Design a protein with these regions (language model features):
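Membrane-embedded alpha-helical segments of multi-pass membrane proteins
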Residues: 70-78, 139-147, 155, 201-208
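Membrane-interface helix/loop boundary segments of multi-pass membrane proteins
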Residues: 155-180, 212-219
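N-terminal, membrane-interfacial amphipathic/helix-forming hydrophobic leader that caps
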Residues: 1-91
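Hydrophobic alpha-helical transmembrane segments
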Residues: 10-18, 67-70, 106-111, 142-143, ...
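Membrane-helix interface segments
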Residues: 9, 91, 101-104, 138-139, ...
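Juxtamembrane helix-loop-helix connectors linking adjacent transmembrane helices
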Residues: 34-67, 89-158, 165-170
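Small-polar-interrupted transmembrane alpha-helices in polytopic inner-membrane proteins
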Residues: 117-120, 173-190, 204
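Functionally important transmembrane alpha-helices
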Residues: 27-29, 199-233
């Protein structure tokens, strides 16, 4: 029995990758359809052809991209509910959504992300690598960006840390589990615009950082908040 349990964790984690992409693709296309309908109605700015051609779609169609990401979130949550119910046979909340310590974890994660970005920004300013020119304050864009990054952070942390890392820990020690889950986290961004090997390496390191707290707490609130803060700031 122990041998079966040992193999089942890593196998479940790896086999979940294909349905993850399938569900993500299907629900993102549903989101594109909804955004297209809203664009034709003049409610938001959206054109399917230019969206696919845009080098940075989020910049040009922020509202549409936010809608698409929330449909992605719905799809991935549906997939994870199915997997937890019929494969893992555990409650969905066991992914790491315990409410204990939720507020403190969120505050700590948001604060740490802000501090890390502030330190990095200050170092680059000091070294002359970047130069502050101006600050473009657009409340609508800021709110949409925040909502967008909430969806991105929740999807990626719930799947990579809450499901993949959780199952890998059933088979391997924390170090091996962190390495494998971080590699998967990095590769999930392989098709992102302008991604390169340096970016993938940075994502791998970020995956380690985001996964460490989950290993010890089995709670997703801190890595979600840190991921959100990292992206937003």
């Amino acid at each position: 029995m122990k041998k079966v349990t040992y193999h089942r964790g890593w196998l479940t984690a790896i086999l979940s990758i294909i349905p993850f992409f399938i569900f993500s693709l299907i629900f993102q296309f549903i989101g594109i359809g909804v955004s297209s309908a809203l664009g034709q109605a003049g409610i938001i700015e959206f054109n399917f052809d230019t969206y696919l051609e845009a080098e940075d779609a989020m910049r040009d169609y922020l509202a549409a991209d936010t809608i698409i990401q929330y449909f992605d979130l719905i799809g991935i949550f549906l997939l994870l509910w199915i997997l937890m119910k019929f494969v893992d046979k555990e409650p969905f909340i066991n992914l790491g959504f315990s409410i204990k310590g939720k507020v403190n974890d969120i505050i700590l994660g948001m604060t740490l992300g802000l501090l890390l970005m502030a330190v990095g920004y200050s170092i680059l300013i000091f070294l002359g690598e970047i130069k502050f020119v101006s600050f473009n304050y657009d409340l609508k864009s800021i709110v949409l960006l925040f909502l967008l990054f909430i969806a991105v952070s929740v999807v990626e942390e719930t799947y990579v840390r809450g499901y993949v890392l959780k199952n890998l820990l059933k088979s391997f020690n924390p170090v091996v589990s962190l390495i494998i889950s971080s590699a998967i986290f990095s590769l999930l961004h392989f098709f992102n615009p302008n991604v390169n090997y340096i970016a993938l390496t940075e994502l791998f390191i970020a995956g380690i950082l985001l996964g460490v707290s989950y290993v010890y707490t089995k709670n997703l609130w801190f890595p979600i908040a840190l991921h959100l803060s990292w992206n937003f700031f």
